[in-house]
C-alpha cells in the first residue's frame, strides 16, 4: 500500500516544479487520512480537506500485466465521491484569472460540471481528466479548455475504436465538436496525441523499463 491518486500525485508534482498549489479533497476519518496529511506536509503541499465521518478515504487497486506493462485500476472513491461545489467555494477567494484548475471524475458528475463551470467563468485554465470515466452533461465540455483522456476513455467518450492514427484523429475531432479547445489523448506505450488549438500532432512513447 502506498500514497497516490491522480489528484495528489499531480498536485505534488506541480508543487515540486515550483508552482503554488492547493489540493482540495475529501477524506475519511481513518488512518489513511493521517497518512495522506503526513505526505502532503512533507511535500509542503497545502491541502484543503473535508473529513467525512461516514465514509472511508478513497482507495484504488492497480493491477499490472507484467508481460505488457499495461495496467488496470479498480477504484473505490469513498469520501472523495462526495466532494461538492461547497469544497470549491471554500477556496474560491484564492483563485484568479489565469490560474490552472484541474479536476477529474472521482466526484459526482454534477460536482464536476459545477466546478468546471465556476472555474471557467473565473477565467481559469481548466483541465479535465475524465477518469475514471463516467457520463456527464454535454454542456460540461464547453467549460474544458484542455481534456486529457487515455486511450480507453477516449473510446468511451467518442464511441470510436482507436486502432490507428486516423482513428485517433477522428476521436480528437469528435471531442473538439463537444466544445473542448485542446485535447491530449495518452496512448500508453504508443505515446500521446494532442490537438493544440490548430494542429493534431503525435508524440512517440519512450520505454524506460520497470519503474
Features from the language model and the residues they span:
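Substrate-binding N-lobe of the ribokinase-like
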Residues: 1-59
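Short beta-strand scaffold segments in enzyme catalytic cores
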Residues: 12, 59-63, 72, 191-195
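Anion (oxyanion) recognition and catalysis
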Residues: 15, 41, 120-121, 176
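Short gly/ser/thr-rich secondary-structure transition/capping motifs
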Residues: 44, 81-86, 126-133, 205
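Conserved phosphate-binding/catalytic loop of the ribokinase/pfkB sugar-kinase fold
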Residues: 51-52, 62-100, 105
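Conserved beta-alpha-beta core of the PfkB/ribokinase-like small-molecule kinase fold
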Residues: 100-170, 190-192
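Conserved phosphate-binding/catalytic region of the ribokinase-like
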Residues: 135-139, 165-211
